[in-house]
From Swiss-Prot:
PANTHER family noted in UniProt: ALCOHOL DEHYDROGENASE (PTHR42901:SF1)
Entry similarity comment: Belongs to the short-chain dehydrogenases/reductases (SDR) family.
Lineage: superkingdom: Eukaryota
Keyword NAD: yes
The protein's name: Alcohol dehydrogenase
Organism the protein comes from: Drosophila pseudoobscura pseudoobscura
InterPro entries the record matches: ADH_Drosophila-type, NAD(P)-bd_dom_sf, Sc_DH/Rdtase_CS, SDR_fam
Binding sites annotated in the UniProt record for substrate: S138
Gene from which the chain derives: Adh
Length: 254
């Protein structure tokens, strides 16, 4: 899929991986890049505009933990501005197993709520045009870092939720896939802690192993968006992009 003249809404598009991905996106000659983030970063917005002045870049403050009704209200404003949204990227995430409720609220519940809100506009059963959802998971979603089970569990939930969305595409008209970064050098990794402090040096230990830069991750992130494969589970690790084959151990029969 060519991203030329597409309208993209990027939740958490100013974070570590998020900002590098936004830089790559504007190089693709989007029509609009709408960034929703908790904290404004005027310098980053100015930089993105300078990379490609032809792309209209808009920022709205957004906390993914707000109720669905508030998200729907914000999306209504965005749709009024850009008319159509082609791609939604759900990228909000924290890695803090000391904050159990907030980790789940940001990493999973917020993603589900944002998705639920945009379906109000996209769902073909309501006359919507459909759309594409790219959810940011993590390699911990299919193989946990056991010292951070809350974070890992929240990312496993993202993978399963997104796989369900993909299978619902014939009903809703909305396709979906996950991009799942491996250990990437960002402030998120440097600051994170373990559940109940079972491993006080968990961040330090992880960084002793091979990692990738956020730029490497961002380049493959955008490649995955361009490939636009419904139901894909992409692994973005050590500068590579690889599809993961999910093994089915049970079938609901419905």
């Amino acid at each position: 899929m060519s991203l030329t003249n597409k309208n993209v809404v990027f939740v958490a598009g100013l974070g570590g991986i998020g900002l590098d991905t936004s830089r790559e996106l504007v190089k693709r000659n989007l029509k609009n890049l709408v960034i929703l983030d908790r904290i404004d970063n005027p310098a980053a917005i100015a930089e993105l505009k300078a990379i490609n002045p032809k792309v209209t870049i808009t920022f709205y403050p957004y906390d993914v933990t707000v109720p669905v009704a508030e998200t729907t209200k914000l999306l209504k404003t965005i749709f009024a501005q850009v008319k159509t949204i082609d791609v939604l990227i759900n990228g909000a995430g924290i890695l803090d197993d000391h904050q159990i409720e907030r980790t789940i609220a940001v990493n999973y519940t917020g993603l589900v709520n944002t998705t639920t809100a945009i379906l109000d506009f996209w769902d073909k059963r309501k006359g919507g045009p459909g759309g594409i959802i790219c959810n940011i998971g993590s390699v911990t979603g299919f193989n946990a870092i056991y010292q951070v089970p809350v974070y890992s569990g929240s990312k496993a939930a993202v993978v399963n939720f997104t796989s369900s969305l993909a299978k619902l595409a014939p009903i809703t008209g909305v396709t979906a896939y996950t991009v799942n970064p491996g250990i990437t050098k960002t402030t998120l990794v440097h600051k994170f802690n373990s559940w109940l402090d079972v491993e006080p040096r968990v961040a330090e230990k992880l960084l002793e192993h091979p990692t990738q830069t956020s730029q490497q991750c961002a380049e493959n992130f955008v490649k995955a968006i361009e490939l636009n494969k419904n139901g894909a589970i992409w692994k973005l690790d050590l500068g590579t992009l690889e599809p993961i084959t999910w093994t089915q151990h049970w079938d609901s029969g419905i």
